[in-house]
Amino acid sequence: MDVLFVAILAVPLILGQEYEDGEELEEDEYYQVIYYYTITPSYDEFGVNFTVDYSMFESENTVNRLDEKVEASETTISYETDRADHQKPVIEKPVTMEPQSPDLNDAVSGLQSPGPLLLSWALIQGVMYFL
């Protein structure tokens, strides 16, 4: 890479010099030399390792399991005023919601109607006709 960089910088400087005896090169006599080197790394020294680290997937599964197993205790709410004996405490259970996965039918519903498909096909055919 360094050789290519030096060659690109040095060639115009060498070819663009003015001669002392008054002889100058014409513009059509100029030429530029560029050397291209391709460096291909050798992988013979290193063993290829296609090991997949499953720890990320395991931690994702743990997080998903924790989301589903939310344990909440019952909550007692009493609306106390001066005369608390006339009111009964209200017991509410907390609502636990499981994470919802996207429904596959929602993704496929756009494919069930042929309208957009026919419109895009007609548009492509029209463009190809005019080209």
Swiss-Prot record:
GO terms for cellular component: extracellular region. It is found in: Secreted. InterPro entries: DUF4634 (IPR027957). Keywords: Glycoprotein, Secreted, Signal. It comes from the Eukaryota. The keyword Oxidoreductase does not apply. Residues 1-16 form the signal peptide. Glycans are attached at residue 49. This is Uncharacterized protein C1orf54 homolog. It comes from Bos taurus (Bovine).
